[in-house]
A protein has these predicted regions:
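Nucleic-acid-binding surface
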Residues: 57-202
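Short beta-edge/loop segments at beta->alpha junctions of small alpha/beta modules
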Residues: 1-75
Length: 202
């Protein structure tokens, strides 16, 4: 099979991201042969590696691929990326920030870097699908809650916050309802204290 023919058949899958195993089945070749074909296609800039065994097309926005990175677990865009999307911070993040029930991990790809942060299943809510239903974005309230919640963790990764302006659509009532769902009373109290400080300065 020629490289061009292989590329045509892979495009027939109609997927934004595809696994080496899927390509092997679709092309009717072994996994090692499929891997070799994909590496050659990458050398010619036809496909892009995301992580081991996962590929995508050039010029695909990384934001639309986060669920593929965390599969089989779901994820949604949050933290700095969602705060910027909602106009709550002015600095453009150079990393795509997501939360997921998957473990915390950072993926550096040719398309950019995705930073995935673990949330417990009981806090995996407060997001909306985009119009194409290919990716999900945290609401303004949930993006802030995720930021404050993860700042209370042992790593203190988000302990320092950027200057935040509350979006016009931000609902204090919805935010308070979300805070009440934090199962750990100590972390719930910590998040509420940080929020009160932020709201007092806003």
């Amino acid at each position: 099979m020629t490289l061009i023919r292989a590329l045509q058949k892979i495009r027939e899958l109609g997927l934004p991201a595809f696994r080496t195993a899927d390509v092997a089945i679709h092309l009717g070749v072994s996994a090692s042969n499929a891997s070799q074909i994909l590496r050659r296609l990458h050398q010619h800039d036809h496909v892009v590696p995301l992580k081991r065994g996962l590929w995508t097309w050039p010029n695909t926005h990384l934001m639309t691929l986060t669920n593929h990175l965390t599969a089989p677990f779901p994820s949604y865009i949050s933290l700095h990326t969602a705060l910027y999307y909602h106009g709550m911070i002015s600095q453009i993040p150079d990393i795509i920030y997501c939360v997921s029930v998957a473990r915390t991990r950072r993926y550096s790809t040719p398309l950019g870097t995705a930073s995935i942060h673990h949330l417990p299943p009981e806090l995996f809510f407060g997001y909306k699908l985009d119009s194409s239903e290919t990716w999900a974005m945290a609401t303004p309230e949930k993006a802030l809650l995720d930021f404050l919640y993860l700042g209370s963790g042992k790593t203190r990764l988000f302990a320092a916050w950027p200057e935040i302006d509350l979006a016009d659509s931000f609902s204090h009532r919805r935010f308070k309802t979300m805070v009440a769902k934090i199962p750990d009373p100590k972390r719930r109290s910590y998040v509420q204290r940080r929020a009160d400080k932020l709201f007092g300065a806003a």
